[in-house]
């Protein structure tokens, strides 16, 4: 059924956003309609057996994948944004990137107590963003049932930070 080698559609950008980092650019995959469709279909397959109410995803590329998956799976979508981007009252978490510190914000009423959540993002690198997303979901009373990523940078050992969670990835480096 699935036929594409999706790794072919990921472009390596050396020394971006800073020297020593190899950025895995998914825009060629997004640009190709067959690759994008197959990536979404395959990511949905990764979580077909999980029961959840909402897909939570961070900007920017997480929005693209998360919203598409939420639509395909018939679930609600919750955007998580950088500071100052959401119009209503928010709660936030700080986290470390492999190249700095950032904050993630979510509307304080985005998740109801007890709702089950799938977290979606484009790349699982250090696990810092995923940890912050988990903390946000828990802060609002939600339960993270799974995390799904298009790409995992296994050489950074991100799963160590996510022990105890169901982590699914499509492409592993």
From Swiss-Prot:
Q: List its EC numbers.
A: 2.4.2.7
State its location(s). Cytoplasm
Question: Which Pfam families does the record match to this protein?
Answer: Pribosyltran
* GO MF annotations in UniProt: adenine binding; adenine phosphoribosyltransferase activity; AMP binding
Q: Which GO terms describe its cellular component?
A: cytoplasm
Q: Which organism is it from?
A: Thermotoga maritima (strain ATCC 43589 / DSM 3109 / JCM 10099 / NBRC 100826 / MSB8)
UniProt entry keywords in alphabetical sequence: Cytoplasm, Glycosyltransferase, Purine salvage, Transferase
According to its UniProt entry, what is the function of this protein? Catalyzes a salvage reaction resulting in the formation of AMP, that is energically less costly than de novo synthesis.
Chief place of localization: cytoplasm
> What is the name attached to this protein's record?
Adenine phosphoribosyltransferase
Assembly and oligomerization:
Homodimer.
Which transformation does this protein catalyse, written as a reaction? AMP + diphosphate = 5-phospho-alpha-D-ribose 1-diphosphate + adenine
Gene3D superfamilies assigned to the protein according to its UniProt record, in alphabetical order: 3.40.50.2020
Q: Where is the signal peptide?
A: none
* Any one GO biological process: purine ribonucleoside salvage
Question: According to its UniProt record, which protein family does this protein belong to?
Answer: Belongs to the purine/pyrimidine phosphoribosyltransferase family.
State which pathway it belongs to.
Purine metabolism; AMP biosynthesis via salvage pathway; AMP from adenine: step 1/1
């Amino acid at each position: 059924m699935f036929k594409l080698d999706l790794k072919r559609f990921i472009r390596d950008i050396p020394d971006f956003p800073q020297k020593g980092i190899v950025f895995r650019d998914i825009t060629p995959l997004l640009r190709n309609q067959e690759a994008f469709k197959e990536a979404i279909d395959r990511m949905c397959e990764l979580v077909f057996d999980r029961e959840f109410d909402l897909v939570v995803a961070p900007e920017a590329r997480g929005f693209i994948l998360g919203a598409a998956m939420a639509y395909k799976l018939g679930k609600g979508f919750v955007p998580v944004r950088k500071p100052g981007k959401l119009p209503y009252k928010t709660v936030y978490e700080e986290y470390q990137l492999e190249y700095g510190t950032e904050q993630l914000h979510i509307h304080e009423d985005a998740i109801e107590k007890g709702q089950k959540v799938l977290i979606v993002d484009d790349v699982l690198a250090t696990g810092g963003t995923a940890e912050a997303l988990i903390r946000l979901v828990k802060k609002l009373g939600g339960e993270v049932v799974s995390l799904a990523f298009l790409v995992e940078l296994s050489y950074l050992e991100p799963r160590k930070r996510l022990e105890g969670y169901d982590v699914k990835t499509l492409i592993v480096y």
